[in-house]
């Protein structure tokens, strides 16, 4: 649901949307991890340049070949992902281009990083000679459907694992490769728990529901315009750095897209729903923590050591409350 993302097009929040509409509690929806080194080769999804390349001696530089991470963190280019992504974003906001400088990396680049080498070759770039253009990209959703450590959700009989689940194991930020815990470890736990349950007779799916779903997907070509508008707005307003104004703009954008695209696409409906939850979470967390950065609340606050649990049934009232508060604040500014 972000314009710049490593996620495949088949990953658009459907699992979270389905669980939410069934009544499941969602949590930590505001925490989206952005990977700093997506290869800016005009591809969708964006291919990644692994951190291992920086560990092997690659630098992050701007168009003046200045290493902008020097002095930011003791580990320089190997600082935590969120910090690197934020500083890449800052460079871009200042009008700079950002690059991965691999010219001092091992001569065995093609052997050690064949996938990255392949993308470079297709783009007409040689990592031994050329700077590789990069940009930060949406990579991993830490929030999702709230589960316990057995994979149980708030709904009896509904289990979740993988990126759709919010188990709490990542806190407010994710360490590289810890997604394996959510996919492989919790996948196994959930499967074992489900298999241990007595077999129940399942009711047949209502054919009217199937027809309704097909009806919602018949205008896919028209929906593409709105899907891109949504992704662009989410990246621009709810991306790496957020603030009150951008969050409200993002919410207005999503509501406008929802009004104009009614009935066009089930996929778009799911994207709109998940975007709303992310926006509400970002609005409520008036601090910066982990991969959630607000430029208007830069500090981490003790009174926000908590989770924001959200439900589909509360969505409209939450949105109305946020918009009313924003309107009142704007009115006071005009009066003053």
Q: What is the predicted role of each segment?
A:
Residues 1-5:
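Flavin (primarily FAD) binding-site architecture
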Residues 6-7, 31-34, 164:
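Short, ordered loop/turn segments at secondary-structure junctions
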Residues 7-20, 26:
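Thiamine diphosphate
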Residues 18, 24-132, 193-199:
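An anion/pyrophosphate-binding glycine-rich loop and adjacent beta-alpha core
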Residues 36-38, 137-138, 304:
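Short secondary-structure boundary/hinge segments and terminal tails
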Residues 61, 66-70, 77, 140, ...:
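Glycine- and aromatic-enriched mobile tails/lids
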Residues 114-159:
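FAD/FMN-dependent oxidoreductases across multiple families
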């Amino acid at each position: 649901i972000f314009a710049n993302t490593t996620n495949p097009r088949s990953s658009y929040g459907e699992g979270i949307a389905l669980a939410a509409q069934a009544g499941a509690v969602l949590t930590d929806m505001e925490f989206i991890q952005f990977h700093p080194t997506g290869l800016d080769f005009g591809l969708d999804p964006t291919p990644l340049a692994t951190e291992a390349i920086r560990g092997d001696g690659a630098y992050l530089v701007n168009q003046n070949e200045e290493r902008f991470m020097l002095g930011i963190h003791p580990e320089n280019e190997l600082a935590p992902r969120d910090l690197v992504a934020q500083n890449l974003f800052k460079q871009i906001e200042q009008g700079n281009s950002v690059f991965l400088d691999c010219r001092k990396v091992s001569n065995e680049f093609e052997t050690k990083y064949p996938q990255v080498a392949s993308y470079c070759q297709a783009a007409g770039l040689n990592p031994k000679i050329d700077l590789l253009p990069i940009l930060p990209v949406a990579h991993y959703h830490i929030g999702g459907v709230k589960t316990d450590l057995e994979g149980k959700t708030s709904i009896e009989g509904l289990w979740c694992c993988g990126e759709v689940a919010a188990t709490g194991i990542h806190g407010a930020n994710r360490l590289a490769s810890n997604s394996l815990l959510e996919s492989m470890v919790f996948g196994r736990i959930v499967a074992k728990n489900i298999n241990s349950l007595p077999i129940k007779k399942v009711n047949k799916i209502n054919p009217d529901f199937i027809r309704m779903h097909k009806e919602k997907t018949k205008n896919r070509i028209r929906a593409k315009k709105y899907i891109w508008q949504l992704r662009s707005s989410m990246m621009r307003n709810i991306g790496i750095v957020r603030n009150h104004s951008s969050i409200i703009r993002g919410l207005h954008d999503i509501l406008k897209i929802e009004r104009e695209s009614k009935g066009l696409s089930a996929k778009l409906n799911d994207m709109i729903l998940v975007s709303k939850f992310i926006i509400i979470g970002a609005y409520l967390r008036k601090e910066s923590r982990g991969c959630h950065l607000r430029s208007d609340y830069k500090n981490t606050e003790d009174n926000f050591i908590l989770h924001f649990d959200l439900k589909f049934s509360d969505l409209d009232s939450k949105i109305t409350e946020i918009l009313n508060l924003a309107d009142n604040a704007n009115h006071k500014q005009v009066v003053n």
